[in-house]
Amino acid sequence: MGRSVYVVVWVCLALLVSGCRRSADVSTEEQPFLVNLDLNVALSDIAVPRSRVSSDAAPANDDEKMQTLRIIVVRPDGTVEANRFVKPSVALVYDRQERFKVVGREKKQVYLFVNEGNTVVETMDGTPVSAGGKLSEYLTAIGVGDSFPAGVLASLVIRLDGDSAQLSGALPMNESHEIEVGATDCSFELFVTRAAVKFTYRITNQSERNLVLTGLTIDRMARREYYLPHGTVYADNEDGIREIVQYDAVPADYYTFVYADDAISDAGIALPHGKTVELPAIYLLEGKSAEPYATSLAINGIEQRKAFPSLPQLPRNTHVVVNVRIPRYGNGAVEWQVDVVPYDEVSLEPGFGV
């Protein structure tokens, strides 16, 4: 009798231990495998060797830098794993390391949004993304565990109304990256791209008299662009500088941008002889015009035009630098030089008089 009792007790203990082990195994399988994910974010033209970037490629002011940054990490099933908003004390070109605790052994999509508070977007049919049209309200409402609205974000556009409208304040920047997180802690260097085309005009008056700029236009500019890069492919050129080699543009009407400035509206912008005048930067939208881009300047009321045959496309983050020289002698015709940075620091048509 005593022996039977001991046998029963040992059997019960064995079953209990076995059950606990199975329970522990199941619990271990259900627990996600977590690792540290460190992300560093830089402007696309800063994330290259600095010796290869000209001064025109560097950010000119705080509007061209990161004033706020949002990082959203999305798992393979489309679930939001993290949504973090960062507001540094000063505008940055390179963000400090941001660490996330995430599930390992899987690919993830990382969405980066910069300067969202100054960005107004809408859907393709013109519907505002939020009550006030502000992107920040929409992004803030995306919670961890929610299904990420990739389709909605891919359809958002920025629009400029009016022939003199341009992007102002902190420029919109963004990007999405696919990363593969392994079984150990890992880090990635990511970049964001400015969703704008920048024009810089420098006018050098080498004539013997003071002149006045009374007008400036840029032909074939797009009224709308995708907020996020759309169908965009990047490649490093021979100088190691990242450039956009393929992208989609919003099918939209093109128009002639008319530069509006209080000085031009009144008496024009003074062009003193022997001096170089640089106009405030102009920020417009990317496009894919089937016709050549062109610009015109009116000096003392006389218009002069220049086509850009070597500038077939204007992807985002392009910086077009237009140098204009008014020669000392001649029939009054100006000479033009056009450079594009940071993607291509070589003059499209080297030298003046082209």
Show where each model-derived region lies.
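C-terminal motif of bacterial Sec signal peptides marking the signal peptidase cleavage site
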Residues: 16-19
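Bacterial lipoprotein signal-peptidase II cleavage site
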Residues: 21-27
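Short, low-hydrophobicity acidic/polar segments
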Residues: 34-38, 42-199, 204
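Acidic, serine/threonine- and proline-rich intrinsically disordered appendage/tail regions
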Residues: 314-354
